[in-house]
Amino acid sequence: MAFAASHTASPSSCGGVAQRRSNGMSPVVAMASTINRVKTAKKPYTPPREVHLQVKHSLPPQKREIFDSLQPWAKENLLNLLKPVEKSWQPQDFLPDPSSDGFYDEVKELRERAKEIPDDYFVCLVGDMVTEEALPTYQTMLNTLDGVRDETGASPTTWAVWTRAWTAEENRHGDLLNKYMYLTGRVDMKQIEKTIQYLIGSGMDPGTENNPYLGFLYTSFQERATFISHGNTARHAKEYGDLKLAQICGTIAADEKRHETAYTKIVEKLFEIDPDYTVLAFADMMRKKISMPAHLMYDGKDDNLFEHFSAVAQRLGVYTARDYADILEFLVQRWKVADLTGLSGEGRRAQDFVCTLAPRIRRLDERAQARAKQAPVIPFSWVYDRKVQL
């Protein structure tokens, strides 16, 4: 996860790099100094890490026409992956019914089950929930993408309909996990709520440059990452004996898998009609490294909260550097990147880069694990400052 969480800008052949070169700018790592981080901790709407020199609108004008022409395809191939509201699960389906006579007994039973779950698992579950709760940021991010954004807030275009409906489906995830953890009594809800507010106020910097090629590559990767993460928290919950929590996490994972299918279909179509630019975009995102959506996470105390949460997730096997490599390898195979033909020289170099990257990531991870020392134990405000090993 530590590898997956990193995010640096780096040279590539996609449109954003051409813009960087034309502006005479070099790629930068957007990390504030310790002094700056101390200062920003006193500013309630500023992230602990400031983001600088963001590339904007790297999509060439002629590429935008592709997304206009894909509207009929998107209507036929994306909207059928959404579930009607009346057939969708809702958070209340998994929680004690407050109107029933047995409500208090059900809550007591839930709290008894939660007592058997260790703090490090709750750190992972809270981190996943906080990530889900920053949904306004993700809808905003999708609506920065040229050619597919919701221009009015209620646009009838297929891309806009998809984004709003996707957001509506995702909204249930954070709601359900939030209510469940509130009922457990195991976590500091005020600290969690502060973390959510900080995160939404901070935004995110995925490096997608208003470019839907980059944006849909990013969402393809992220939906698979969240599918894996929620699937692993479901497995752990079952091992701890909380079958209801396992069901909750598994149900959320199933949604993420369906959304992954949609976004990977979009990129598959882009590879079909515009393979050279798409493989350049793929290499661009992987050179930058995929930043996790909550990489600007902050709780008002820990300037490195996301890295600490990621380290616990890595140790527990909830989401790891190996998962990052596996996702990349899965996408390369899913999109048949190795089989692409007729590419430009730059396209062939990008193809080689993405097709050989996963094994390199695994080797780096193996070396890092071999050198790893005993991880420190630090307090997490989410669990009342109890100490958890990283």
UniProtKB/Swiss-Prot annotation:
CDD domains: Acyl_ACP_Desat (cd01050). Its cofactor is Fe(2+). The keyword Ribonucleoprotein does not apply. It comes from the Eukaryota. One of its GO terms (biological process) is fatty acid biosynthetic process. Converts stearoyl-ACP to oleoyl-ACP by introduction of a cis double bond between carbons 9 and 10 of the acyl chain. Belongs to the fatty acid desaturase type 2 family. This is Stearoyl-[acyl-carrier-protein] 9-desaturase 5, chloroplastic. It comes from Oryza sativa subsp. japonica (Rice).
